[in-house]
């Protein structure tokens, strides 16, 4: 049964402006929002702003799917790429919210085209 659905769109230029801005500001943003593995993946790509935008969209979509629980940190939501399709790992308050909802599986899809990155998150389970 579908327990939650979240969708988000991020303008790649918005992330590009942050990355191209003052280095201290860019570093604060990256450290607050992205886990070390996410940063390593994105920084190793030529289109790093697009990759960061897609992951930011995934985090926003996940929060929406979870019903925007209070206190979720960006680092509680990590996009992993194990050679196949990306997956979303929940930790902390995000994982607690998923358990309360009865989530058994998190589905994630990412895409980017025309200067935007889009993510959709579907939460599947039996419910509380």
Curated annotation (Swiss-Prot):
<keyword id="KW-0460">Magnesium</keyword>
<dbReference type="Pfam" id="PF01648">
    <property type="entry name" value="ACPS"/>
</dbReference>
<dbReference type="GO" id="GO:0008897">
    <property type="term" value="F:holo-[acyl-carrier-protein] synthase activity"/>
</dbReference>
<dbReference type="InterPro" id="IPR008278">
    <property type="entry name" value="4-PPantetheinyl_Trfase_dom"/>
</dbReference>
<keyword id="KW-0808">Transferase</keyword>
<keyword id="KW-0443">Lipid metabolism</keyword>
<comment type="function">
    <text>Transfers the 4'-phosphopantetheine moiety from coenzyme A to a Ser of acyl-carrier-protein.</text>
</comment>
<feature type="binding site">
    <location>
        <position position="8"/>
    </location>
    <ligand>
        <name>Mg(2+)</name>
    </ligand>
</feature>
<dbReference type="GO" id="GO:0006633">
    <property type="term" value="P:fatty acid biosynthetic process"/>
</dbReference>
<dbReference type="GO" id="GO:0005737">
    <property type="term" value="C:cytoplasm"/>
</dbReference>
<dbReference type="InterPro" id="IPR037143">
    <property type="entry name" value="4-PPantetheinyl_Trfase_dom_sf"/>
</dbReference>
<dbReference type="InterPro" id="IPR002582">
    <property type="entry name" value="ACPS"/>
</dbReference>
<protein>
    <recommendedName>
        <fullName>Holo-[acyl-carrier-protein] synthase</fullName>
        <ecNumber>2.7.8.7</ecNumber>
    </recommendedName>
</protein>
<keyword id="KW-0479">Metal-binding</keyword>
<feature type="binding site">
    <location>
        <position position="60"/>
    </location>
    <ligand>
        <name>Mg(2+)</name>
    </ligand>
</feature>
<keyword id="KW-0275">Fatty acid biosynthesis</keyword>
<dbReference type="GO" id="GO:0000287">
    <property type="term" value="F:magnesium ion binding"/>
</dbReference>
<dbReference type="InterPro" id="IPR004568">
    <property type="entry name" value="Ppantetheine-prot_Trfase_dom"/>
</dbReference>
<keyword id="KW-0276">Fatty acid metabolism</keyword>
<keyword id="KW-0444">Lipid biosynthesis</keyword>
<comment type="similarity">
    <text>Belongs to the P-Pant transferase superfamily. AcpS family.</text>
</comment>
<keyword id="KW-0963">Cytoplasm</keyword>
């Amino acid at each position: 049964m579908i327990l939650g659905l979240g969708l988000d769109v991020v303008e790649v230029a918005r992330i590009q402006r942050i990355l191209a801005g003052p280095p201290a500001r860019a570093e604060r943003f990256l450290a607050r929002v992205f886990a070390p593995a996410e940063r390593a993946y994105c920084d190793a790509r030529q289109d790093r702003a697009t990759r960061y935008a897609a992951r930011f969209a995934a985090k926003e979509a996940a929060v929406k799917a979870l019903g925007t629980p209070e206190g979720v940190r960006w680092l509680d939501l990590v996009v992993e790429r194990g050679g196949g399709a990306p997956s979303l790992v929940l930790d902390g308050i995000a994982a607690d919210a998923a358990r309360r909802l009865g989530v058994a599986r998190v589905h994630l899809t990412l895409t980017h085209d025309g200067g935007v990155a889009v993510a959709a998150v579907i939460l599947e389970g039996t419910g509380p």
